Curated annotation (Swiss-Prot):
Keyword vocabulary terms for this entry: DNA-directed RNA polymerase, Metal-binding, Nucleotidyltransferase, Plastid, Transcription, Transferase, Zinc
Protein name: DNA-directed RNA polymerase subunit beta''
Main localisation: plastid
Family: Belongs to the RNA polymerase beta' chain family. RpoC2 subfamily.
GO biological process, one term: DNA-templated transcription
Assembly notes: In plastids the minimal PEP RNA polymerase catalytic core is composed of four subunits: alpha, beta, beta', and beta''. When a (nuclear-encoded) sigma factor is associated with the core the holoenzyme is formed, which can initiate transcription.
Subcellular location(s) per record: Plastid
Binding residue positions for Zn(2+): 220, 291, 298, 301
Catalytic EC class: transferase
SUPFAM superfamilies per the UniProt record, alphabetical: beta and beta-prime subunits of DNA dependent RNA-polymerase
Domain of life, source organism: Eukaryota
Co-factor remark: Binds 1 Zn(2+) ion per subunit.
Source organism: Cuscuta reflexa (Southern Asian dodder)
Cofactor(s) this protein cannot do without: Zn(2+)
Length: 1379
């Protein structure tokens, strides 16, 4: 060894980082040869010490952590609490998954820290501790799996497994944990085998793209540069230093008047430190992006060589170095995944804690309420928020970073070290996210219910895709679904009670056709008679406005009803519109089907602003043949306002109401034929009337035949009109495609001309390139009449202005301008529709919601029925409403229905078990058949008063043995009532034996003495929600449209209590009253004076953006998909998740979803640029900025993957690759037919130079090719053919006569020539034309130098604009979102 000298002994541990610094300093001071000699001595010393120590590893050296037991127990307790939250509907499945993952990840990390402390305190010389924490062998993650806990695992797809492995490898795994562990181990093996080949193929493609990039000049003379700044808050200082070192300045740098660095100066460590200390201006540097060359690069734009620390030499193949620099780390990093065994290495959020006790205050205007990703309520701040904590005498200030969650309320008292805010995790974790779709499946069968927050997706008009507008619950009402094969033979109907176990039913009695299921709902019981209600006196009222007529709702088509011209009650917050009966329609002149009412079918009965409430189809605007409409030259509204839109068919399909007073219909005959039909007429031929077209089809008119063949059908059109050939019809050519008014004189040939008597339409028919003629087609003119007598159509009382709403009449054309209209033979086409539009007068101070809820209300006393349409403007109550897909179940009645008792005696026989249930029927539209669901007593919970309790209002759950059979109803009638469900057939029909009779849909004035039903008095519920005993002397006015019922004890009617609604949904553990135990989750289906029946239900919380499957009221079986969540998840912390992303970016595949507002953002960007610089400069600089920003974005995306793994690649290598895949443009117009063809790929610089040379703009758009496509679009066909698709490339090159100039390395290797790099480069360049190694070339000609300076001066003026904008928008990412 070398002779020792007296040096200072540094007693410090040399880890990997310290060793790197030592080697770097040794190279700087002593050089490469002497440094290698010193390192050999260090290696020899290490081997000697390791041999002397003789560390061995045994199973006794694996020391377990004593605190592991209570840590795991605490994590299990937190998971159990969160599971209860999910069952009660407080959090959804994704929030529970996130919370579970973070709980177990935090537990695992804490155990890892405890493991290190345990080793240091108990056995610091433990061999496991020495090896792992010194970095000699193994790492902390592996030792943690040996002595801590194996933790969360990833499956082979990289998805997280929710169930953690609580055991470690020292203790041994259970069978379940072993299977989960095999997932992670298999993931490591698969990644090691498969990903290595992927990384190798990625390296090959990268080298193919840039193999011809060689340094061929010293300076390209560019004046452009990329501006970077260390103090804009966007770039960390470490990355800023790595970006600058080795670059060349593109412009001088000044601090005040003093120049500290000049253009073309190499940036070293000293200059970077000087720039950081002086806080200089933004620095403009030269990069491969700014080089003006096309197929090579200059020394100054490339910068310093990484091998010897000086400017790169001429002839160096920097392209191949760049390709290997990116691809080779991926090959090496795939081997790391085997050692961690697929263990999840994610990240958790960071917390901000209170420094002391005190009251916290912050500005509430800067935050808004939200939910955390775990479902907790919090406040979200988008900018920096300053929080003050006032203790006794000290005022603490805490700065909360942007995009954080505030977990406490304003003016709340907090304790020291309490978590007050949650900040977003670091960029290394957050930026690596992927979008996941998680499906939630139903645990049991039942019936789907949802709230008004679920809306139909407008892009799927006829599908069953539903989305959520805000956070709400989905409910599966428990029941036992039966398959549709059993329904067809079943005699049971909706609300019948039957056995839940036996479906073999025989029925001896069949009701007459004049009796429908809703009027004759039978309670099936063994040998029991249905009670006869004929002796119950119906209530007759003397006042005209309260006469109750028998009426039903005839179904015209889906969701259409008759509209009445009778009464309309006016209230402050609602409309009440009576619906007309059949008998009332018989005495009117207008036909029954003329006016129809529309309840939105896909919006759960919600009328938004400008919704169509009713419509009238005028027979004058009806056609029986096909054609198209033309609005003529009359213009529509130029300014589109929000109130000019009409919501059509309940979905977000908005149509602009056009102010046209006249429109035209162009008739034509259209036949839609199957693709296999044999047509007996020729295309583009003339036929007469009644010509045989097919075997069983004849033409109704004569004219020109036009046949269009589409995918699976043939569209045959017959145009009738006059035909003029273009011999002298030059005048007609000017009128082609326009409407010609009467009185216009047109020339039909050279000599003749005629005046047009009626409106005509001139259409040009092209037979081939040189053959065409004109077809003059007749028009049918329609005038839109505003003078329709509204009193005969709609009730005049409805059209009056109200405080909160207004109904207005609007005429609009059903079909767009020029749109083809297809009609069937037996169906007519309606052109104009007169609509009654619902307009909401929204008050700014009003607390009502913008939308109104519509529901069909039925008022009945015994067999007297009346239907109303009710529109509420109040906010939606707690109860959920929605659409039932069993609309009305009512059939047409006989004329003598009013004289028949609806409840006649019947004897029904059925073998019943003790377990009774009630049937609910639904119409399954997808299958086209009915399905039923049986609600048995096991699915209900009954709450009764506690006997002997001190309080009268205490309710407890009854025991099952006391009530073996839950008797739901004691008399004829349905099982409870429902909330205001649109189009519901069973709406508030509750006939019971209780003291409270539900009559809250009834008006009474001057009623006769109290009528008795089974010797019980009627009790009414007034508007103040009190139960009132009837007084025959008083004029009682009831709240006819209020759903809420009081839940009172019979001995305490005067007391007030919580209001419960029929149909209301109650979550589990929600306390309605402090004196009562909490209810189970379910729906209130029956309310008595002394008890309430709740149908058990399972709530599913869903957040905005979730997709709801199925339809409202649809029957779900166990395991069916209920809802799908879209959420973001951090990627696993290994390169296997990053390498595919690098490949996606380099191949220009779509990584993230495109922003919904992308078009608007691009338009705003263009307006901003043109506003700053003016229109001519704006378009040019905007186009260049787009290319520059997209290149910077791609570089940043690729760098993030490798920096996350701790791999440092210089930006210049990635920039060379990105420069090649973004250097082509696509010619978009035939503006230069003599140079380029449309669709041709050319170089960007070539297009710019050609445009300047020819003084003619070239229309092109920039494209990202991807590395594979860029390898197949080079200047060398030999290089392309040796890559892939050899036959196609060579044949295409031979047909095109391509010439290969052998400028790249690969083509010279293939042909055995000297590669144009290294020493072979000097033979290609004339020595007299080579640049000197000086940075500034000499000026041989004064005039030439002056011209050059002049051009450079103008170029600098342009580039100064460009550099300024690039600096301001350096981090704008417009093409790809960071994942």
């Amino acid at each position: 060894m070398a002779e020792r000298i007296n040096l200072v002994f540094h007693n410090k541990v040399l880890d990997g980082t310290a060793m790197k610094r030592l080697i770097s300093r040794l190279i700087d001071h002593f050089g490469m040869a002497y440094t290698s000699h010193i390192l050999d001595q260090v290696k020899t010393l290490g081997f000697q010490q390791a041999t002397a120590t003789s560390i061995s590893l045994g199973i006794d050296d694996l020391l377990t952590i004593p605190s592991k037991g209570w840590l795991v127990q605490d994590a299990e307790q937190q998971s159990f609490v969160f599971e209860k939250y999910q069952h009660s509907g407080n959090v959804h499945a994704v929030e529970k998954l996130r919370q579970s993952i973070e709980i177990w990840y935090a537990t695992s990390e804490y155990l890892r820290q405890e493991m290190h402390l345990n080793f240091r305190m108990t056995d610091p010389l433990n061999p496991v501790h020495i090896m792992s924490f010194s970095g000699a062998r193994g790492n902390a993650s592996q030792v943690h799996q040996l002595v801590g806990m194996r933790g969360l695992m990833s499956d082979p797809q990289g998805q997280m497994i929710d169930l953690p492995i609580q055991s470690n490898l020292r203790e041994g795994l259970s069978l379940t944990e072993y299977i989960i562990s095999c997932y992670g181990a298999r993931k490591g093996v698969v990644d090691t085998a498969v990903r290595t080949s992927d990384a190798g193929y990625l390296t090959r493609r990268l080298v193919e793209v840039v193999q011809h990039i060689v340094v061929r000049r010293a300076d390209c003379g560019t004046a452009r540069g990329i501006s970077v700044s260390p103090h804009n808050g966007m770039m960390p200082e470490r990355i800023f230093i790595q970006t600058l070192i080795g670059r060349v300045l593109a412009d001088d740098i000044y601090i005040g008047p003093r120049c500290i660095a000049t253009r073309n100066q190499n940036i070293g460590v000293g200059l970077v430190n000087k720039l950081l200390n002086f806080r200089a201006q933004p620095i403009s540097i030269r990069t491969p992006f700014t080089c003006r060359s096309t197929s090579w690069i200059c020394r100054l734009c490339y910068g310093r060589s990484p091998t010897h620390g000086d400017l790169v030499e001429l002839g160096e193949a920097v392209g191949i170095i760049a390709g290997q620099s990116i691809g080779e780390p991926g090959t090496q990093l795939t081997l790391r995944t085997f050692h961690t065994g697929g263990v999840f290495t994610g990240g958790t959020a960071e917390h901000v804690r209170a420094p002391s006790n005190g009251k916290i205050r912050f500005t509430e205007d800067l935050v808004h309420p939200t939910r955390t990703r775990h479902g907790y309520p919090a406040f979200f701040c988008s900018i920096y928020l300053y929080v003050t904590i006032q203790s006794q005498d000290i005022l603490h200030h805490v700065k909360i970073p942007p995009k954080s969650f505030i977990l406490v309320q304003n003016d709340q008292y907090v304790e020291s070290e309490q978590v007050i805010a949650e900040t977003r995790a670091g960029a290394s974790t957050l930026n690596y996210k992927e979008k996941i779709r998680k499906h939630i499946y139903s645990d049991s069968g039942g019936e789907m219910h949802w709230s008004t927050n679920v809306y139909h997706a407008p892009e799927f008009t006829y599908g069953n895709v539903h989305l959520l507008s805000k956070t709400s619950h989905l409910w599966i009402l428990l029941g036992e679904p039966c398959h549709s094969s059993l329904v067809s033979t079943s005699i049971h109907r909706d609300q019948d009670q039957m056995s839940a176990q036996s479906l073999s039913v025989k029925r001896r009695y069949t009701s007459k056709l004049s009796e429908t299921n809703d009027e004759a709902k039978q309670k099936i019981a063994s040998e029991d008679l249905i009670a006869d209600y004929s002796d119950v006196n119906p209530s007759r009222c003397t006042d005209h406005y309260n006469l109750v007529y028998p009426a039903i709702l005839p179904i015209l088509d889906e969701n259409s009803y008759f509209f009445s011209n009778c009464l309309s009650k006016r209230r402050r917050n609602q409309f009440i519109i009576p619906l007309q009966s059949i008998q009332e329609h018989k005495n009117q002149l207008m036909p029954c089907s003329s006016i129809s009412m529309k309840i939105p079918p896909n919006a759960n009965g919600i009328f938004c602003a400008n919704s169509i409430l009713a419509y009238f189809d005028d027979p004058r605007y009806r056609r029986n043949n096909s054609g198209s409409t033309k609005y003529g030259t009359l213009e529509m509204y130029s300014t589109i306002k929000k109130e000019d839109f009409i919501q059509y068919r309940g979905v977000n399909e908005f149509r602009l109401k056009s102010k046209v007073e006249r429109f035209f219909f162009i008739p034509e005959e259209v036949h839609i034929l199957p693709g296999s039909s044999s047509i007996m007429v020729r295309n583009q031929s003339l036929i007469g009337v009644d010509t045989q077209i097919t075997l069983n089809l004849r033409s109704r008119v004569g004219g020109l035949v036009w046949v269009e063949r589409k995918k699976n059908r043939i569209e045959l059109k017959i145009f009738f009109g006059d035909i003029y050939f273009p011999g002298g019809a030059d005048n007609l050519s000017r009128h082609s495609g326009v409407l010609i008014p009467p009185g216009t004189e047109i020339k039909t040939n050279y000599k003749e001309s005629k005046k047009v008597k009626n409106w005509i339409y001139v259409q040009r028919i092209t037979l081939s390139k040189k053959k065409f003629f004109f077809l003059v087609r007749p028009l049918v003119t329609y005038e839109i009449m505003d003078g329709i007598p509204l009193a005969t159509l709609f009730p005049p009382d409805l059209l009056q202005q109200r405080e909160n709403a207004q109904l207005r009449v609007v005429n609009y054309i059903l079909h767009g301008n020029g749109k083809p209209i297809r009609g069937n033979y037996d169906a007519s086409i309606q052109l104009v529709r007169t609509c009654l539009v619902f307009k909401r007068n929204q008050d700014k101070k009003s607390s009502y919601s913008e939308a109104a809820r519509a529901s069909v209300v039925e008022i009945r006393t015994n067999y007297l029925i009346r239907h109303f349409l009710r529109i509420d403007f109040v906010k939606a109550p707690i109860s959920y409403i929605g659409k039932r897909y069993d609309p009305l179940g009512l059939g047409l009645l006989a004329e003598d229905w009013t004289h028949k008792n609806p409840y006649s005696k019947a004897r029904i026989h059925q073998n019943l078990n003790q377990n009774k249930g009630t049937i609910h029927t639904f119409f399954n539209r997808n299958k086209g058949s009915q399905s039923l669901i049986i609600l048995s007593s096991s699915n209900c919970s009954r709450m009764d008063p506690a006997n002997g309790a001190k309080s009268n209002n205490v309710i407890q759950e009854s025991k099952k043995e006391e009530y073996p059979m839950l008797q739901i109803s004691n008399s004829l009638g349905p099982l409870g009532t429902y909330p205001p469900i649109a189009n519901c057939d069973s709406f508030n029909r509750l006939l019971t034996h209780n003291q409270i009779l539900v009559t809250n849909y009834f008006h009474l004035d001057n009623v006769k003495p109290p009528f008795q039903v089974f010797k019980f008095k009627y009790y009414f519920i007034a508007e103040n929600l009190k139960i009132c005993n009837y007084n025959p002397c008083s004029n009682l006015r009831l709240n006819a449209f209020y759903l809420n019922l009081n839940f009172l004890h019979p001995n305490s009617c005067a007391e007030t209590s919580k209001i419960m609604s029929l149909g209301q949904f109650i979550c589990q553990n929600v306390c309605i009253d402090k004196t009562r135990p909490p209810f189970k989750s379910g729906q209130v289906i029956f309310i008595q004076v002394d008890s309430v029946v709740i149908r058990l239900a399972k709530p599913y919380l869903a957040t905005p953006g979730a997709t709801v499957h199925g339809l409202y009221g649809e029957t779900f079986f166990g395991g069916d998909t209920v809802v799908t969540f879209n959420y973001e998840k951090s990627r696993s912390g290994d390169i296997t998740q990053g390498l595919p992303k690098v490949e996606q970016v380099l191949e220009v595949r779509s990584v993230d979803s495109i922003s919904m507002n992308l078009e608007g953002r691009v338009e705003g960007w263009g307006k901003c640029i043109t506003g700053i610089l003016g229109i001519p400069w704006g378009f040019l600089i905007g186009a260049e900025l787009t290319i520059v920003q997209s290149r910077i974005s791609l570089v940043n995306k690729i760098q993030k993957v490798y920096r996350f793994q701790g791999v440092h690649i210089h930006n210049r290598h990635i920039e060379i690759i990105v420069r090649q895949i973004t250097s082509k443009v696509l010619v978009s117009e035939d503006g230069m037919s003599n140079v380029f063809l449309p669709g041709e790929l050319i170089g960007l610089l070539r297009a710019e130079r050609m445009g300047r040379a020819l003084e003619e703009p070239i229309h092109y758009r920039s494209v990202f090719l991807g590395i594979t496509k860029a390898s197949l679009n080079t200047q060398s066909f030999i290089s392309e053919a040796s890559f892939q698709e050899t036959a196609r490339v060579l044949s295409k090159a031979a047909l095109g006569g391509r010439i290969d100039w052998l400028k790249g390395l690969k083509e010279n290797v293939v042909l055995g020539g000297v590669i144009p790099a290294g020493t072979g480069f000097r033979g290609l360049v004339d020595p007299s034309k080579q640049y000197n190694k000086n940075n500034i070339p000499l000026k041989n000609n004064l005039f030439e130098g002056g011209m050059t300076d002049l051009l450079v001066h103008h170029r600098k003026l342009f580039d100064s604009f460009l550099n300024t904008l690039i600096y301001h928008h350096h981090r704008i990412d417009r093409f790809y979102n960071d994942s």
